[in-house]
Structures are given as structure tokens and as C-alpha cells.
Amino acid sequence: MKILHLDTNHPTLLEQLNTAGFENHEDYTSSKVEIEKKIHNYDGIIIRSRFSIDKHFLQQASKLKFIGRVGAGLENIDCRIAKSKDIELIAAPEGNRNAVGEHTLGMLLSLFNKLNKTDKEVKKGVWLREENRGVELDGKTIGIIGYGNMGKSFAKKLRGFDIEVLCFDIKPSVGDENCKQVSLGELKEKADVLSLHAPQTARTEKMINTSFINSFTKNFWLINTARGRSVVTKDLVLGLKSGKILGAGLDVLEYEKSSFENLFSKNLMPDAFKYLITAENVLLSPHVGGWTQESKEKLAQTIVAKIKIKFSANKI
């Protein structure tokens, strides 16, 4: 089988696929149009987020048997068309779930203890203690929306705290020893913190809007290490200004065209984002929640293992 690699990844990915008997070709620079002209020669492709795999692209891929996405989400792939062509979709949420869990916890603790603000102040020679009293996590209720690989990883990281962890998921019976599954209504009633871990779907897009925010009983902190389009940023800003949202940790933004492209290619910064970058109770990172030295290798290993199980004649 011939595999076309469209993004660089950890060396172990190519090494192990070569060992397993696959023929691997690399093209990290050609345009999407140029790739479309030769994709009919390949049985598989491996991609991160270089470009979208849309209907037109898939129509050219007459031999394609699988798409390996070195990451968790598949929103940049036309999954309906791929499935209609019997193309196997292989993702690797297991590969970076630990990284996402740690990043989410790090953001939460940083917000509670105002680490972003105090770091900047001390570096400017400002020494304020009373103004920077933090908040303890113990005694709080954490609400998680989306209890798959990422949500479970975050809940596991919380085990050392004296807190209650609740989750809402459209799938039944996903709760475990780290988290109690509840209705969305109960989560909204009890949560001090809302952490998003749901994939991008029609149901989750623009889910966090003014109506949703105001339906929470308590004022709350928001953490989003999932997908930026789940949050309506202008409504988030209204929540921050009113105090309904006490602070926000955002690893993803609705303005992203895709995970790793330049956020503002036309230098048109939305007003809501201007507020976020100046707000002391907002912590931002550039979609790196699952982006660690360790996860880079784990993602590669996960993709290789799944490809071997499905397609390799030399199964290990």
C-alpha cells in the first residue's frame, strides 16, 4: 500500500510504517491542487491540519482506503463523503489526551491564582499581594461537557482535589469513578467551573452563547481546550464584563480557520478578541493543549498501531 504523508510528524511514524511494509511518500510543500492531481495513486494519506479534505478532493482519490489524522478531531474532513466511499477515518485522540488534561488543569489553576497577571506585574516591579489573593479549587464543583478521551483525562487529573466532578455527554453511561454523569440542567445548577471537551459538531457549534451562559445558577469560570467554534466570543465577552463568567482559559478560538493557521491573516482583529487580550482574567494559548514533546510521539504511535491493525499484512 502507498501512503502519502502531507505533514511532518514524529520520525517514529515513518520508521514504523516502513518496517511494516508500507510504501511511504512525503509531500509537505505542494499545493492542495497539486496534491489532488496525484492523490489517485495512493491508498492512504496522513495529515494533521494542512488543508481540508473536502468532497472535491475525495472525488479525485479513487484508490483511497484510509485517512490518518494525527490529532483528535475530524472536522476538517468531509466524513460523510469519506464514509460513502468506504474510506476508513483514523484519528488519534488517545495520543494527546494526557497533554490536554494537564493543559486544562494548568489553565484552571493559573486563573484561580492569577498567575498570568502577577507574572506580568512582578516583571514590571509591581508587588501587589492583597489585590492578588487567589481562589482555592477545593470545595468547588467542576462541570465537564464532553466525557470522551479528553474529558476523562481532565477528570483523572482532578482526583487529588477535594471537589465534585460532574459531566454531561449525549452518550449514556459514560461516567466513571472520577466523574458523575448528570443532566445538563444539573450541571448548570451546580458547576463553579465549566470545562469544554466536546468535538465540533452542528450541536456544539456556538453552544456557549448568552442564553447558555446566563442559564447557570452560579457565576463560573470557563475553560475551553476543545474547539473554538463552540464559544460565541462576543457573548463570552459580555459574560466576562457582567461578572457571570469569572474568568476564561482559552486554548482555542472561534476565529481559527484551522488549528495551526495564522489567526489573523488580514490583520482584522475582532473587537471581542481585543477585549480578551487585555482582560486580566483571561488566559490564552495558541491551540497547544495537546501539543507536547510526549504527545507528538504518542500521536504517531497511535496512528501507526491503528493502521497496522486495519491494513498491514505484517500485523504486530
Place the predicted regions along the sequence by residue:
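Short, Asp-centered acidic motifs that coordinate Mg2+ and/or phosphate
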Residues: 43-44, 66, 193, 221, ...
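Rossmann-like dinucleotide-binding domain for NAD(H)/NADP(H)
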Residues: 219-222, 227-316
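A short helix->loop->beta-strand "cap" motif at the edges of active sites that frequently abuts
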Residues: 61-66, 85-87, 163, 218-220, ...
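Phosphate-binding beta-alpha-beta segment of Rossmann-like dinucleotide-binding domains, i.e.
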Residues: 85-87, 93-141, 153-156, 160
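Short, conserved active-site loop motifs that form the nucleotide-linked donor/cofactor pocket
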Residues: 22, 87, 179, 245, ...
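An N-terminal-biased, well-structured beta-alpha scaffold segment characteristic
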Residues: 1-90, 187-189, 209-211
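Rossmann-like dinucleotide/phosphate-binding beta-alpha-beta segment
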Residues: 1, 130-218
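Short glycine-/small-residue-rich Rossmann-like dinucleotide-binding loops
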Residues: 50, 192, 197-200, 226-227, ...
